[in-house]
């Protein structure tokens, strides 16, 4: 499958939500509400099938603190998995971080092997206090988080 990456449009929100909820139902990531998606729309990029123009993946880069950003809400449609969509989305977010002068990018994930192949290494959640107090404290799984914290230093 050929695909292109692009910034999101308002019309992508429902598709992004559907992708995220599908992955959340499989316990691959945490769900995001429409409110969160609209509030953070500018953080997202999408992968679009070059032939059909359907959105087949999404990922967001969220700046969390000086010099630190998070790759979050990575989701790829089942029919597009295994074709490099997720890898390209994460690489684009990491590249975006560099344009902001951010040299540390982290993720909280259940997909440890995938992120390890992209150069991320496991870290203690203790090195991410801004994340814990900004987002994690609102999570229904807090304080019993079962996601793995991973980081790449650029």
Kindly give the residue locations of the regions a language model identified.
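C-terminal "cap" of GNAT-fold acetyltransferases
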Residues: 128-154
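Conserved active-site alpha-helix within GNAT-family acetyltransferase domains
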Residues: 103, 109-135
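Conserved acetyl-CoA-binding loop-helix of GNAT-fold acetyltransferases
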Residues: 82-95, 107
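Conserved glycine-rich acetyl-CoA-binding loop
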Residues: 54, 77-88, 100, 117
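A short beta-loop-alpha structural element at the N-terminal edge
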Residues: 2-16
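Active-site rim helix/loop that mediates acceptor-substrate recognition in acyltransferases
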Residues: 19-51, 55
